[in-house]
């Protein structure tokens, strides 16, 4: 269990208790879900959320005594796991379109769907790399031979990278240089380990990684609106709603902002 924070989180605890009261009032039948003050919550989350959700989880655990277990991966792969019956309580995707897909299949609690953040992408290279760039068009230069992006077929940040390269008019020239990561964290690791010179990754990971990075203009790709929802099969709806509420609370928003959201 992550260590308990001080009483400065009392307002959050009050919020959680209020949500518990609302849930109890809605359903007079005997409750089978775990209350937000105890138990365990399993959250599937896109890889770009790793650092920020780990901090959110620590804060939430300390305030509620609900242990949060995270499963991080590419949004597409996590979506397929949910479709195949993975026992997640809440899913935070890197693009709300995947939440819409699950809603169409009747796999989420409809009123729990929400957009919680908008993502950005960056060019990232290691500090010791001799590569220098000012913008995405520089990736077409011959001295840059290997570029990593997340697989656009199942990773929203990879799709945004592909769209940006196409909009910049360099897709055809850089496509032979591309190395695809299964998710955005693996994509960053390719650049960190020197397997590629440059990676296109999320702003969140760039901020929290020791390297040089440049923002890619938002107008080069479709918005990365990140959505979440509670799974219809959850046995812990009360805690899942409390965690979702914490993400959008003033405290949660401050943490999200610190990580580039």
Show the residue positions of the predicted features.
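Bacterial N-terminal signal peptides that target proteins for export
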Residues: 2-13
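C-terminal motif of bacterial Sec signal peptides marking the signal peptidase cleavage site
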Residues: 20-24
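Exported/periplasmic ABC-transporter solute-binding proteins
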Residues: 25-65, 69-71, 76, 80-84, ...
């Amino acid at each position: 269990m992550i260590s308990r924070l001080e009483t400065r989180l009392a307002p959050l605890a009050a919020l959680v208790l209020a949500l518990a009261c609302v849930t109890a009032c809605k359903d007079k039948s005997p409750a089978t879900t775990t209350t937000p003050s105890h138990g365990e919550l399993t959250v599937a989350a896109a890889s770009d959320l790793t650092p920020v959700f780990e901090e959110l989880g620590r804060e939430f655990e300390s305030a509620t005594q609900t242990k949060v277990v995270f499963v991080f991966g590419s949004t597409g792969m996590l979506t397929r796991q949910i479709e195949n019956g993975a026992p997640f309580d809440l899913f935070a995707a890197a693009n709300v379109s995947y939440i819409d897909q699950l809603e169409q299949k009747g796999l989420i609690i409809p009123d729990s769907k929400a957009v919680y953040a908008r993502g950005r992408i960056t060019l990232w290279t290691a500090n010791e790399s001799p590569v220098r760039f000012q913008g995405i068009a520089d990736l077409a230069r011959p001295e840059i031979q290997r570029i990593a992006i997340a697989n656009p077929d199942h990773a929203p940040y990879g799709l945004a990278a592909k769209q940006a390269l196409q909009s910049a008019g360099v897709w055809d020239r850089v496509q032979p240089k591309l190395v695809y990561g299964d998710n955005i964290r693996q994509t960053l690791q390719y650049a960190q380990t020197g397997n590629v010179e440059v990676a296109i990754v999320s702003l969140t990971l760039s901020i929290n990684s020791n390297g040089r990075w440049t923002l890619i203009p938002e107008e080069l790709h479709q918005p990365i609106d990140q959505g979440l929802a509670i799974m219809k099969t959850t046995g812990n709806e009360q805690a899942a709603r409390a965690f979702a509420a914490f993400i959008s609370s003033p405290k949660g928003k401050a943490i999200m902002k610190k990580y580039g959201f």
